[in-house]
Amino acid sequence: MPLVVHTNDAVSLTDADLDEMGSIEGAFDIGTISKAKEDWVLATTARIDDKLHGFTFSTLERIGGTPCVLLGMMSIRRSSKRDQVLRGLMGEAYHRALMAFPDEDVVVGSRFVTPDALIAFDKLDEVTPSPGTNAVGEEREWGRRLAKRFGVDRKYEATLFVAREGQTGFLDFASNTPEKVKPALAEMFSVLNVPAGDVMVVYGWTMAEDLVKHGQRS
């Protein structure tokens, strides 16, 4: 059956909707999901056979004049369809960005706790931080801006792009093939103390000409 992806205003979610989101056995409990409803503008769901397989809370806005897609929370059911669901949710994010910011380069940012979830950003350019690169200057400044917007700047370490006690939301995706994660990427994430609440702030760019392709409805 086809994947059905739908976006609504987050404020329109009912208690039943939130309970359903909590039932996919992802990383977030009902309290955290309810807080995301308050913090973010858009709520996107992905269904197969009318069964919820994933959701996103996000906002499209400008930071310092630059168009941004802020993925405040994403969670995907651990099923054989997880890769398809991830592609669908990211495709919807790109589509919304294309509608809001046509002909502009756009920053896409989120928080991560595992390296395999970074597959979500495989269509982005200049993903930061990245193994083997040393982010400086404006690159680090973008990390600070996003940490502040995510509300995790109080204990943010700019050189590592790590926010302590920052798990109010992140991109919750577990790959079917975690063994394929490159050792250098796993090493980059080794600085996180995930049980203590650490997250890594990661962002990338989609150029205007690429966004036209990524944001097209299939």
Question: PLM features: residue spans?
Answer:
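Conserved glycine-rich acetyl-CoA-binding loop
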Residues: 77-88
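Eukaryote-skewed repeat-based solenoidal scaffolds used as protein-protein interaction platforms
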Residues: 87-98
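Terminal substrate-recognition subdomain of acyl/acetyltransferases
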Residues: 1-13, 34, 38, 98-218
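A conserved beta-strand-loop-helix scaffold within acyl/acetyltransferase catalytic domains
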Residues: 5-79, 97
